[in-house]
Amino acid sequence: MTGNKYGSAAAVRREVAEYLRPPRRMPVAEGIKQFMFVPRGANTAVPWDDTLTPYMNEAINTLSKREYDAVIFAGPARTGKTLGLIDGWIVYGIVCDPADMLVVQMTETKAREHSKTRLARTFHHSPEVRKRLSPSRNDNNVHDKMFRDGSFLKIGWPSITVFSSSDYKRVALTDYDRFPEDIDGEGDGFSLASKRTTTFMSAGMTLAESSPGREITDVKWRRSSPHEAPPTTGILSLYNRGDRRRWYWQIG
């Protein structure tokens, strides 16, 4: 005689209750440190270590502060910008404060690569993220990720199709100075991205990070205020519109 297996109402109740909890009130950098494992190749990973990139913590924590509507980070390549600000923010959002999010890479090829190598491996090695992924195969492909709580992650590239119609609480633009200056005749990427978060009012956040790569428009320019960047387009133009924080190293 074959026995029948039935679902447990208690188990379903516990699972549903997990996703009805309010957001975890912790600094974003602390959430990343607690929940994100950084892949080292395909099969190994290590916990995020914020002591390796201490200059990232203030920018990362500003991502959850409602008095700001954007974070602009300009810095050299290979300094942990994408890992901390992009991948880390994604992990924090999934575990601590679920909401729809759009990540925009500089090309469709880079969006696919980011999803299949960095994000897929990070999700696999981070237990709290892995258990929140939707079990349905149809809910998880290269550019679209659904989670058990109903939140959605889109990994796209600079096109008016990606920037149109949908609303997101969080939008992240990576390698911004490699974006087209005008996207499909509709404007710059940051302006288009910022419009996607307006529905969420002060809770919405737009992030742009990049190493500077645009031409200076006035070669005779001289700085007239602290931390002012040269006149140009792209990430430094956005940086000049903000409060212009800068990290200083203490020598000796």
Mark where each language-model region is.
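Phosphate/NTP-binding elements of NTP-utilizing enzymes
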Residues: 2-252
